[in-house]
């Protein structure tokens, strides 16, 4: 009995402080209406004001895909197992009773998780020089019962920045013996940035010098994420080198290649022309020779006929005399 009273007090206190109930990843949550199920005609369930399911006396339909394997929905309850960070939000059940009355049940859920967003962006780049800005942001974290404010560190062994979390946003609750955060998390202030420069031809003796780490420390736990900033520069240098190689070929080389290609194409066309038209040209010559020969024969025949005709006329003229 005493445990239940404390639990109810904790829930009410959290609702009063942050308007939500905090859960850890993989917890189970039950959102239920206290209306007698026999009085309910149907219930519509919402997640962040979007309908996710409709429950009737006969069936429930309309589950969204991310909930299918982890949710159980009925007329009176929405149960989610194995909570994920992205399950955070506002859940609402609107029950339509058989007498026309509408009953609404709402719960704001905040799922605590340790999430670090560590990114690198090139600010300045030449063929030999590269400057990268590394940014680390804590997008979510679980304090796990810590009684001291957390803090974050970004950098390498030799170069780093430190940031304590503001206690105004992360308050210590004596009854709970731990720090709590609001909903949504005021993560806009939980970020660090640091810049680093790299020379392309510098010999790297220790790979850890280029590894940037972002840590979140608390009283009894920590978690971190790592990023090799030099790899970002090397990728940009490789892309720059590829672009240089692609554009370094002189125009004359391109023109020469084009000329050679054109010459080869012309030679091929000439060969094709010769192959296509050499036979017709020989036939024409043969026809001309035949025509000349026939004309010569005809001319000879005409001359012979003329000679015979002249000979006969001469003979007849001699007889008459």
From Swiss-Prot:
GO terms for cellular component: host cell plasma membrane; membrane. Residues 1-20 form the signal peptide. SUPFAM superfamilies: Immunoglobulin (SSF48726). It is found in: Host cell membrane. Glycans are attached at residues 41, 72, 79, 108, 144, 220, 245. It is a single-pass membrane protein. The chain crosses the membrane at residues 286-306. Its main location: host cell. Belongs to the orthopoxvirus OPG049 family. This is Protein OPG049. It comes from Vaccinia virus (strain Copenhagen). The gene is OPG049.
